[in-house]
C-alpha cells in the first residue's frame, strides 16, 4: 500500500516546493530546469491531491532525496553559455545553475529548508509584502523615475538578475566564514543587487523586493551549509530562518572591526616620539590603541608595548633604550613616567635659555632717514673697527673700573665730619683730612 502511494505521488515528501515554478517565472529557453519544472504536477492548497497530469511527471532523479535541502540537484545540467567555470574553489557547473540564476528567485524554493524553524511559510505571491522582522532601513521604495535620474546605475525596484554570474565557492569550514561572506557579497553585487547590501555604516539604498529576498535566501543556503555556519549566524537563522539581511549586516560590521584591529596593530608597530608633542598626548594615544585591542579580545602585554615604544623613541628620549635593554620586568606605567620626566626637564631648560640677540655684520651700515624734512638727512654709523680701537669688552671693563673708583672717592669726600681717618699700609702712615674753613 505504501509503495503504491509513493508510485502515485513521488513528490509528496516535498510538499509544494515546486508548485509555483512555472514557465512564466522562468524562461524556458534559458533555465535548465524549465522543462522539468513546467511539467511538474499542480497540487491543491492542502497538497493532498494530484491532477491528471501526474502521468507526464518526469523521473524523481531531478528532485533531491533530502527534503530538508533546498538547493536543486538536477540529474544533468548543460554547461553555461560562457564556457566552463574555473574549478578552483568553485562549484561544478551542474550545481552552480549559472546558466540562469533567476531560478533562485522562485519564492516556492523557500518552503522546504533545514533553516526553517517557523511555520510561517512564504506564499508564492510576487506581491507578498516583505516580512516585518527585516529591519526597515528606508521608509519606502524609491520612485523609479527619481531613482533613475539620481542613480542611473542603480537597479530599480525589480532587479533583473544577471545571467552567467561567477558563483561563490562553497563554505568549507566555520573558520572560513568571514572570508567566504566577502565572496558572497561580491557575488550579489555582480548580480545587480549591490544597492540592497549594507555598506560599511550598515545602511542600504533601498528595500529588497520579495523575489530578491528569495534569491538571497536560496543562494545563501545553497553555498553555505548550515552545519558549517558560525554559532552567531545559526542563532539568527534559528529565530528567523530567512533573515539573511541581518547576517550580512553583522558580517559587514565584523569586517570593519577586523580592519580596525589591523590599523591598530600597524599604528602600534610604527610609534614614534621625539618630544614634539606633550608626553600626556603620547600616553593617551598609546593607551587608547591598547584598550581598543583589549576590547576585541587582543591583550597586549606591558613588555611588548614597551618594546614597541622604545623602538620609536628619538632625540633626548633615545637613551631610554639602553636603560631598558637589560630589564626583564618592564612596566608600561614606569616607562610613561620616565618619558614625562624627560619632557618636563627639556621644557624647563628651553624656558631658561637666554634670548639670542641678533648679530649684525661688522660692515653693515644702519641708515636713518627723516621723512618730514625736504633735505633728507642720512646718518651713517660705520662699525668698521680700526687697529687702534679697543675691543668692546675692554671698554666696558674700563668703564666699570672707573665708576668703582669714583664711587670710593665720593665716599671719602662726604665723610668731612670725621675728625681723622687712618689708612694703614706697609709703612703705617697716618693721614688727616683737610680741616674745614669757616
Curated annotation (Swiss-Prot):
Region (Disordered): 1-88, 364-397, 418-438
Listed InterPro entries: TYA (IPR015820)
Keyword Acetylation appears in the UniProt entry: no
GO biological process terms, semicolon-separated: viral translational frameshifting
Keywords: Cytoplasm, RNA-binding, Transposable element
Superkingdom per UniProt: Eukaryota
Keyword Cytoplasm: yes
GO MF: RNA binding
Feature type site, description Cleavage: 397-398
Region (RNA-binding): 295-397
Predominant location category: cytoplasm
Cellular compartment(s): Cytoplasm
GO cellular component terms given for this protein: cytoplasm
Compositional bias segments (type: Polar residues): 1-11, 19-39, 49-60
Biased composition regions of type Low complexity, renumbered to the chain: 369-381
Matches recorded under Pfam families: TYA
Quaternary organization: Homotrimer.
Miscellaneous remark of the record: Retrotransposons are mobile genetic entities that are able to replicate via an RNA intermediate and a reverse transcription step. In contrast to retroviruses, retrotransposons are non-infectious, lack an envelope and remain intracellular. Ty2 retrotransposons belong to the copia elements (pseudoviridae).
Record's function text: Capsid protein (CA) is the structural component of the virus-like particle (VLP), forming the shell that encapsulates the retrotransposons dimeric RNA genome. The particles are assembled from trimer-clustered units and there are holes in the capsid shells that allow for the diffusion of macromolecules. CA also has nucleocapsid-like chaperone activity, promoting primer tRNA(i)-Met annealing to the multipartite primer-binding site (PBS), dimerization of Ty2 RNA and initiation of reverse transcription.
Domains (record comment): The C-terminal RNA-binding region of CA is sufficient for all its nucleocapsid-like chaperone activities.
Protein name: Transposon Ty2-LR2 Gag polyprotein
Species classification: Eukaryota, Fungi, Dikarya, Ascomycota, Saccharomycotina
Gene name for this UniProt entry: TY2A-LR2
